[in-house]
Amino acid sequence: MVFRIASSPYTHNQRQTSRIMLLVLLAAVPGIAAQLWFFGWGTLVQILLASVSTLLAEALVLKLRKQSVAATLKDNSALLTGLLLAVSIPPLAPWWMVVLGTVFAVIIAKQLYGGLGQNPFNPAMIGYVVLLISFPVQMTSWLPPHEIAVNIPGFIDAIQVIFSGHTASGGDMNTLRLGIDGISQATPLDTFKTSVRAGHSVEQIMQYPIYSGILAGAGWQWVNLAWLAGGLWLLWQKAIRWHIPLSFLVTLALCATLGWLFSPETLAAPQIHLLSGATMLGAFFILTDPVTASTTNRGRLIFGALAGLLVWLIRSFGGYPDGVAFAVLLANITVPLIDYYTRPRVYGHRKG
């Protein structure tokens, strides 16, 4: 009798994978709804574009690799990759950007490594970082939330801007980005970093319309709370574990609090970090990716804490306003090392 020894993972339950991915997609509904409310229909258009391009890219690669297309697409992982990238980019970014990002994410960051379960890096964040480095202007051209916006594009206008760069009336991104103060708006994190470097005091910065929210940036605080609600539902459904989100948020809050106490004139307050940018999206939907995150409980705590520290460092001292994507990828690099030193000890093993 011949016994075959295969490398892990030893089981692969496609039905279970499909169910978890579907739960994550459902949990994203509150966050998507909040982004639609505050930033307009462009988010929905980007999600549709990303979904189609990820499915087509995955199907093409599977066909070339002579693997079952229908069976693999049913695991919903391609849809989730497209969704995460679509909600991470500005809602009126040119159509070709989300297509390029999703195709790169699926073909290079996922299928090139062997497909789902083999990729060491989060595919959606690879796609996002490629776009951010290649097209920094377009990737940082966020619209002001509707509560401080002058021009709010409708569904048809959003489609026209995404595909042609202009609305039917001739408006462009520069016009649509104007806030109630007549100044082009950026995200709370981007505004803070730019203003501090320009020599503005924190007291002055907090008077800007973008910070008119109750807790943090206008619109962004509610978007983050919506992603938090979806994340808590995932925990309740046991689709994700608590270790990574908790250690990530606690570390980010702790670093932000200490930094703010020591340098309140140059560093953002903790609520700005927690309720702006992609904080809650990253904590519950990106870092918890079971393929690219640590697989032990202690490892998950270390992994989340490392990502939280990196996000704060990049936001506070780096060249980019939001460091979630870079933090995720840098933390992904450390996963083999973390798992090696945190794996459970074999029963009966003694220290040498």
Curated annotation (Swiss-Prot):
**So where does this one cross the membrane?**
20-40, 42-62, 89-109, 123-143, 214-234, 242-262, 267-287, 301-321, 322-342
Q: How does it sit in the membrane?
A: Multi-pass membrane protein
EC number(s) from the headed UniProt entry = 7.-.-.-
State what this protein does: Part of a membrane-bound complex that couples electron transfer with translocation of ions across the membrane. Required to maintain the reduced state of SoxR.
Q: Where in the cell is it found?
A: Cell inner membrane
Q: How does it assemble?
A: The complex is composed of six subunits: RsxA, RsxB, RsxC, RsxD, RsxE and RsxG.
Is Translocase a UniProt keyword of this protein?
yes
Q: Which GO terms describe its biological process?
A: electron transport chain; transmembrane transport
Q: Which residues carry this modification: FMN phosphoryl threonine?
A: 187
Lineage, top ranks = Bacteria, Pseudomonadati, Pseudomonadota, Gammaproteobacteria, Enterobacterales
Q: What is this protein called?
A: Ion-translocating oxidoreductase complex subunit D
Q: Which InterPro entries match?
A: NqrB/RnfD, RnfD_bac
State whether keyword Cell membrane applies: yes
- Annotated gene: rsxD
Q: Which organism is it from?
A: Shigella sonnei (strain Ss046)
Q: Which GO terms describe its cellular component?
A: plasma membrane
**Taking the first listed entry, what is the main subcellular location of this protein, grouped into a coarse class?**
membrane
Q: Which UniProt keywords apply?
A: Cell inner membrane, Cell membrane, Electron transport, Flavoprotein, FMN, Membrane, Phosphoprotein, Translocase, Transmembrane, Transmembrane helix, Transport
Family of the protein in this entry: Belongs to the NqrB/RnfD family.
Q: Which cofactor does it need?
A: FMN
